[in-house]
Amino acid sequence: MSAIAVIDFGSQFTQLIARQIREMGVYCEIFPSNIDFETVSKFNGFIFSGGPQSVNDNCSEVSEVAHKIIKLNETINTPILGICYGQQLICHYFGAKVRKEFNQEFGKTKIKILKESPIIKDTWDVNSEVDVLMNHADSVETIPQGFTAIASGIINQTIAIIANEQRKIYCTQFHPEVKPTTNGSKLLSNFLDIANCERDWTMKSFIEKQKEKIQNLVGEKKVIAAVSGGVDSSVAAVLTHKAIGKQLNCIFIDTGLLRKSQTTAMLKEIPINYVDKSNLFLSRLKGITDPEEKRKIIGNTFIEVFEEEAKKIGDVDFLMQGTIYSDVVESGHASGNTSTIKSHHNVGGLPEKMNLKLVEPLRYLFKDEVRLLGKEIGLSDEIIFQHPFPGPGLAVRIICEVDEEKVRILQEVDEIYINTMKNYDLYDKIWQAFAVLLPVKTVGVMGDNRTYGYVCALRAVTSSDGMTADAFPFENKDQHSLVFWRFLQDISSIIVNKVSRVNRVVYDLTSKPPATIEWE
């Protein structure tokens, strides 16, 4: 099977490269810039991502693998594509001068195509002007020996595309993977053709490969699975069960932080043990308000409970989790140069001294790919298309100390919000919707009486992979917008009338970035 390795130097767009290449039918994997060369040496081609560094700084640590890949290209002609910082790194390697750009370029700009090349075949014509996204502080000042200019910036004469056709090395100063770049995905597709990649990666092939990986990793050992009833853990559990059958022991832990009607009953083909540890989780969260501390406490307690259950089963060596790629990215584990946005209870929140080894079959899949996988293995739409629910549960939707009363209030609000949304035929139009209980109370009037109750915030976003998101319905100006505004008016009235401790409802309009989807 053909495969492309993306060496991640910390760009915010790296995941978009991988997603687009996978959508073209070629398997693509992202590796940190300090990855061991032997791990990536057998790939059909390499892409060096953008990043915040400057090649004029000491970049020997982050560029060691890049230098070895360029040496590999010298030997066996493995194609390389450098994007933004990746272009600067390659040019610096070949002795070109990279300067600090006085007119730094951030945002949409135009380039002019100077010459034909396989990298822009059927993409842009010579002499045409093309919209692209630039995002750089440094620029390549001189073209390295053996390379040819394919395109240049119209405003700043930036060296926008260069190519060494003989060695199959291509560089762009702009980001072809981002939408403001016109037809940028075609450039990526051309690179796959240059690398002689077969378009044979599908969910079916992924399933077979993952089953084989799980079997080789686990052997004859037993595995316990963290099943929450959500799409990620459900898909991961069914896939693992298909790989090792009865060696998998699925456990549902009631943390006391779940939705009111959350259940795993839909997974008919897998036996599930129910464990109620709600009192334990709530007691450990007493007095805790910091969101990172909440996540780590929940992560530690979660694993502790699983270790206890593993002892009851006996001879268990592995813990399966439904970790997906957005969890890894936001926890800062995808690249040595990426900062931590938040710890996820099934990634950064794990105790360092775990007594169980991890099985994470979905670790490098995006949410939309997880849903495609769920379809392929026969899960119902009810499971596959349910909205994401965070591993720490309602603890990160209660923006203050967590206790049983606040959980009950938020469960009631959440149930009303989601069920009413379904009645309005809006649920399937929205990527994720949920309610948040705020740490403030406000004055209200009901009947002739003064009230002093909690404020709850409602959130609804559209997204494709969870990496970016827009507040619904502002991304799409259609008939759903009018329906949604009527829905918000109705739902606020229903909530304050049915949930006695809440007297005010607000709606969160913030996109991601700058915010995250969840509040904590």
From Swiss-Prot:
Catalytic residues, chain numbering: 84 (nucleophile), 175, 177
Enzyme Commission designation: 6.3.5.2
Catalytic activity: XMP + L-glutamine + ATP + H2O = GMP + L-glutamate + AMP + diphosphate + 2 H(+)
Superkingdom of the organism of origin: Bacteria
Annotated keywords: ATP-binding, Glutamine amidotransferase, GMP biosynthesis, Ligase, Nucleotide-binding, Purine biosynthesis
Residue span(s) of domain Glutamine amidotransferase type-1: 3-200
Pfam families cross-referenced by the UniProt entry: GATase, GMP_synt_C, NAD_synthase
Database matches in SUPFAM superfamilies: Adenine nucleotide alpha hydrolases-like (SSF52402), Class I glutamine amidotransferase-like (SSF52317), GMP synthetase C-terminal dimerisation domain (SSF54810)
One GO CC term, this protein: cytosol
Listed Gene3D superfamilies: 3.30.300.10, 3.40.50.880, HUPs
Residues noted as binding ATP in the record, renumbered to the chain: 228-234
Start and end residues of each GMPS ATP-PPase domain: 201-386
Pathway named in the protein's UniProt entry: Purine metabolism; GMP biosynthesis; GMP from XMP (L-Gln route): step 1/1
GO molecular function terms listed in the Swiss-Prot or TrEMBL record: ATP binding; GMP synthase activity
Enzyme class: ligase
Chain's role: Catalyzes the synthesis of GMP from XMP.
Subunit details: Homodimer.
Name by which UniProt lists this protein: GMP synthase [glutamine-hydrolyzing]
Record organism: Wolbachia pipientis subsp. Culex pipiens (strain wPip)
